[in-house]
Swiss-Prot record:
Keyword terms, alphabetized: ATP-binding, Ligase, Nucleotide-binding, Protein biosynthesis
Short name of one Pfam family: GatB_N
Cited NCBIfam families: gatB (TIGR00133), PRK05477.1-2 (NF004012), PRK05477.1-4 (NF004014), PRK05477.1-5 (NF004015)
Designated gene of the protein: gatB
Keyword Nucleotide-binding annotated: yes
Reactions listed under catalytic activity: L-glutamyl-tRNA(Gln) + L-glutamine + ATP + H2O = L-glutaminyl-tRNA(Gln) + L-glutamate + ADP + phosphate + H(+); L-aspartyl-tRNA(Asn) + L-glutamine + ATP + H2O = L-asparaginyl-tRNA(Asn) + L-glutamate + ADP + phosphate + 2 H(+)
InterPro entries in alphabetical order: Asn/Gln-tRNA_amidoTrfase_suB/E, Asn/Gln-tRNA_Trfase_suB/E_cat, Asn/Gln_amidotransferase, Asn/Gln_tRNA_amidoTrase-B-like, GatB, GatB_C_1, GatB_Yqey_C_2, Gln-tRNA_amidoTrfase_suB_CS
Similarity field: Belongs to the GatB/GatE family. GatB subfamily.
Quaternary state and interactors: Heterotrimer of A, B and C subunits.
Species this protein is from: Methylobacillus flagellatus (strain ATCC 51484 / DSM 6875 / VKM B-1610 / KT)
Name by which UniProt lists this protein: Aspartyl/glutamyl-tRNA(Asn/Gln) amidotransferase subunit B
Amino acid sequence: MSWEVVIGLETHVQLNTRSKIFSGSSTAFGAEPNTQANVVDVALPGVLPVLNKEAVQCAIRFGLAVNAEIAPRSVFARKNYFYPDLPKGYQISQYELPVVGKGALTIQVGDTEKTIRITRAHLEEDAGKSMHGASPGQSGIDLNRAGTPLLEIVTEPDMRSAAEAVAYARKLHELVQWINICDGNMQEGSFRCDVNVSVRRKGQEKLGTRREIKNLNSFRFMQQAIEFETRWQIETLEDGGKIEQATVLFNPDTGETRAMRTKEEANDYRYFPDPDLLPLAISTEDIDAVRVTLPELPSAMKARFERDYGLSAYDASALTASRSVADYFTATLAEFGGEAKLVANWVMGGISAKLNEEGREITDAPVSPVLLAGLLKRIADNTISSKIAKDVFEAMWAGEGDADAIIERKGLKQVTDSGAIEAIVDEVLAANAAMVEEFRAGKEKAFNALVGQTMKASKGKANPAQVNEILKRKLAG
C-alpha cells in the first residue's frame, strides 16, 4: 500500500506598520543593534503595552481578502517560555480567541484548482534575535525586532504534496503584498513559513505524527525540505521505526532536515489571557472602514481581464501575479487605448525579459507605462513594424527618448507605399530565380525565404502584410 503526505502551514507575516505592535519603536530593518528598542521592548518593570491600531487593521484586511470570519471580540494571551531574546519571559500572542477565523485561499497546481482552508490568523509580537560570533566565546542579543507585529496564518492540513504547499505559500506571499500588509521580503524575514509534515497510508483517515520544519524563507528550500522530510518519514516507518513529534531545521547545504527539539504542545506554554490588555473589540463599522480601502483582489482582477479584455487565463494569471505588474499593465492599457492583447504581449515579453536580465523590479523599469503606450501606438498605426519596434524599445530602455523621437531621428518609419514595396519585390524575385522555382515546385519554405529577402532589402521597413500580399500576387502570375 502506498503512502500519502499530509501538510499544513503556519506562516509568520511581518506587518507593514511604522511602529511595533505594543510600543512606539520603529520597525525599520537594518538599524544598529538595540537602537530601536524602548522600555516596553526590553521589558523594564512597570511598563504597559499599548495595542497598535494599524496592526489590527492589517489583520482585518487579510481576513476580508480570504473571506474569513472577523471576530467581534478577540483576546491577547501570554505564551510563556524562556529564551534569551524574549526579555519578558513570555510572548504576547492570541490563543483561544484569534482576531481572524476560518477562511480559504484557492491555489492552482498545473491545471488543477484546490481550495486550502485557513484555520485562523492571529496577531502576535516577534522575539528579538540572538547574535553569535561577534565576540569570541560570547553571544549577544539584538532587541530591534522584539515587538515587531506579526500575523500568524494557520492552515488546515489540506496539502498533499510539496508542489501544493509551495503553490499555497506563493499565493499567500502574493496576496499579503497585494493588499499591502507585508513587504514580502523573505531574505529579511518578513515572510517565514513553518511546515508541518506527516505521512499515512493512502485511504487511512487518522493523521500520522507530524514534524514541524521551522523558519523556511525560500520557496525552493521549502520544496526541498518537504520532499526530503517525506522520504525520511516513509523510510523510517517502512524500516519499522517510529516518528517522534519534533521541531526540525532544514540544512540547504546538505538538503536534509534534522531534529532540533521535541515539539512542544500548547499546554507547555501555559497560555492565559494577558491582564495588561483588554479584549479587542471590532465592530461592523470598523470592518467596513477597512473594506473600502481594500484593492481589487487578484482573483477578481484576473476574471475581469479575461472577461473584459478577452485575455487567456494564462495571460491574465501572469499579469495579476503581482500588484506592480497589474498596475503597470492597467496604466499602459489606459494610455494606449488599443488592443489589450498587444499590451499584454509586451509586458510579459519585452518588459519582463529586460527586467529579468537586469534583476530589476517593474517599478524601476526605465520604460514607463506612458513610454510603452507611445511605442504601441506606432505599432498599431503601422508607423513601424513589430520587428523595428524591438529596436525602438531597446533605444527607449537605454534612455534615448520616446518612441516618436527615436523613430524620427533614426528614420525608422515603415514603408507602406505599394509602389515602393513592389519595386523591392521585383528586385528580390529577379535576384532569386532558383527560390522562385522552388516555390512553384511546391516548397512553401521558399516563400518565407523570399519574404525574408524582401524585408532585408527594405532594411526591415517594408510593411510585412503588404510584402506578403504583393509576393503572393506576383508568384501566382
